[in-house]
């Protein structure tokens, strides 16, 4: 874990000054809890605080600069401050930590090349960690929670076709798709069937505050067959109450279902032990965020099988699982001793696809509509 790396470095160099930079105070507060030791030679600072106090960079004098979640240093304003710091202390040793060195939505920028001249000491993908049995193999449930807009968009595309024969053919497929979606079990039944630990802890990822509020309103219906009175916690990224809610969620050992609704504060850097699963309520996202959210359900040494509910509101998002599948297939080739000769992705990753019938019809429509 990142906290172990920090602790080892600081213990080995007690007389050196460490400057630890991270995207938010929540991240280093959690890392402090994991370290469980007080060190007087570490100075903690968020990237935004460094940016606001650029004028005091010449007073910092670090021997070691730790860049936590260093892919975030590619952001234009934060990046300027970090570069100014690195230029001011060229002899300071640098340590960067991140789930990925690539900024997927920023022209695939490689921040390991930009900040560390490509020096990567250790790299392990989520898929590799699962294949090598460092992390547990999850149960993965795919379902849709909203499809009205998707059907409307498909209808418009069909109406825009010039060939009447194609219009008629695709309208029939659209009707089949609508029927398949209507006949599929609703989320109330999906959760009742797949959420086998009614007193478990689950992190619910939403795309924004408005989206989170909408999704919380659905909780009474969606989880009614699991627990009629779930404990619901809310984590807004920049609010003081977030720390309190987050701490209460971690401490809750009661007999009720526990749901922590959050936006982005748990995408990176912050870990919660004994989480039984994650619920991804998401539009299409970058691979890094998708894998980080899945990673929140998996903890090394866990004795239980976590469950991932991948709930999407558009068909394109149903294919995000492919990026994890590719990582695992590569790991099977790189580490043949960790599995039997005939073993592959489907043997180690249990997928329950509640969208199978509708997805097949959608693929036919996509091919027809180009």
Provide a role label for each language-model segment.
Residues 173-189, 318-370:
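Long, largely alpha-helical accessory region at the distal end of helicase-like NTP-driven motors
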Residues 286-302:
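Conserved SF2 helicase motif VI
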Residues 231-263:
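Conserved helicase ATPase core of P-loop NTP-dependent helicases/translocases
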Residues 261-262, 268-283, 289, 306-310:
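A short beta-strand element within the Helicase C-terminal
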Residues 58-96:
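SF2 helicase catalytic motif II
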